A protein has these predicted regions:
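Class I S-adenosyl-L-methionine-dependent methyltransferase catalytic core
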Residues: 1-187
Length: 187
């Protein structure tokens, strides 16, 4: 696995040795960032942005954001093996000053933990078998941490049919292999 673009383009990052984490594939990550880059008027600009990466795993998405100019990424992860790899990746690229790791279940997120008023981009990548995505959308809406320019990106299994909460205004859906990427906003 490697960083796709930005200041750390081409740098390899570590992945877990066990099968319990499903790292976001390079191709899918690259496609997500191409969509963000080519829709700057519609979506947030990553430069100096604050990113919330829920179910961070190895941190590949958040690291990509920092590489492309984000000033801060808040990583939420509660699986110990993933946390170890995430910390190793941040140390490897010397990104600790740009990051905050919260070692908790993403469903227990609170305003006090993230300690910022507005988030520019929120990436939700729960386990594919997890069916509580709407609960997270509800929590995020209740916390009032998004603005009109904030972007929500959700990574799901395209084979799983879900009714996404009406609180998320979906602007785009793309399929890549087994992955479905949903782009939207919460007002």
């Amino acid at each position: 696995m490697r960083v796709i673009g930005g200041n750390f383009k081409g740098k390899k990052i570590f992945t877990p040795t066990d099968k319990s984490t499903r790292p976001l594939k390079d191709m899918v990550r690259e496609s997500i960032f191409n969509i963000i880059e080519h829709a700057k008027n519609e979506y947030v600009n990553l430069d100096n942005g604050v990113i919330l990466d829920l179910f961070s795993g190895t941190g590949s998405f958040g690291i990509e954001c920092i590489s492309r100019g984000a000033k801060k990424v808040i990583f939420f992860e509660n699986y110990i093996n993933s946390i170890k790899v995430l910390k190793k990746n941040l140390d490897l690229l010397k990104l600790n000053e740009y990051s905050k790791i919260i070692e908790k279940d993403a469903y227990k997120i609170s305003q006090a933990q993230i300690a910022v008023r507005k988030i520019d981009l929120i990436f939700l990548d729960p386990p594919f078998k997890d069916n509580k995505i709407n609960k997270l959308i509800e929590i995020i809406k209740r916390m009032k941490i998004t603005s009109k320019k904030s972007l929500i990106i959700i990574h799901r299994n395209k084979k799983i049919v879900e009714n996404i909460s009406k609180d998320l205004i979906v602007s785009k859906e793309k399929n890549y292999g087994l992955s479905k990427i949903i782009f939207g906003k919460i007002y």
